[in-house]
Amino acid sequence: MSVWDERAEAYRQSREHSEGWDLELLVDWAGGARTALDVATGGGHVARRLREAGLEVVSSDPAPGMRADVVCPAEELPFADASFEVVTCRLAAHHFEDVKAATAEMARVASELLLIVDNLWISGKDEEANHLRDPSHVRNYSADEWRKLLPETGLDLEDDRVGERRIELEPWLERTRTTGADAERIRELVADRVEDGRLRIDRIALKGRKR
């Protein structure tokens, strides 16, 4: 059993993942499509919202415990080219070992749109905090890095939005069972972004259209 299998229920119940301006934006951007693939679906929140909007959705995730329709990594999607009108990936790219390969693979199986949401790189302190909380965190990327990456993977960047999200700090630590000295160090590292117990996270949503 992987660490993600152990965390699956916490992510299904997570308010951070089940709501937010970026989730609403993804659903809006996908409007009019009939089919979608949600990559690294996690708790399944994007897939659920797209199904509620009337799309036929397939979900994928590398962790069996996430209960996705297909178990596979983002870098190796077992689908033919242009299999889905829309491909989505929300709050997962910072875990990808090769984000460019994963983005190119998601673009390959999309016929029209690739929609990505992820947290933005803020500072070295922020990255240290993320690694302490979750060793599977590879890195966050800057807005400029994302804006450069999509055109390099066969997509025209049609739109992007940057905004912030404030989440409860302690549940964020509890979700990955981070306690003791690691939790204390994380609190120190992110102290300048915490107000009234809520952590500010900067986030980007990107809409890439297949060429």
Regions inferred by a protein language model and the residue ranges of each:
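Conserved class I S-adenosyl-L-methionine
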Residues: 1-32, 45-49, 170-174
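Class I SAM-dependent methyltransferase SAM/SAH-binding core
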Residues: 37-76
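Conserved Class I S-adenosyl-L-methionine
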Residues: 43-45, 158-211
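A conserved beta-strand element that flanks and buttresses the S-adenosyl-L-methionine
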Residues: 88
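A short His-aromatic
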Residues: 94-95
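A short glycine-rich, Lys/Arg-flanked "PGG" loop and its adjoining helix->strand segment in the class I
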Residues: 100-114
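Short, glycine-/aromatic-enriched active-site segment of Class I SAM-dependent methyltransferases
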Residues: 119-137
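Short alpha-helix
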Residues: 139-154
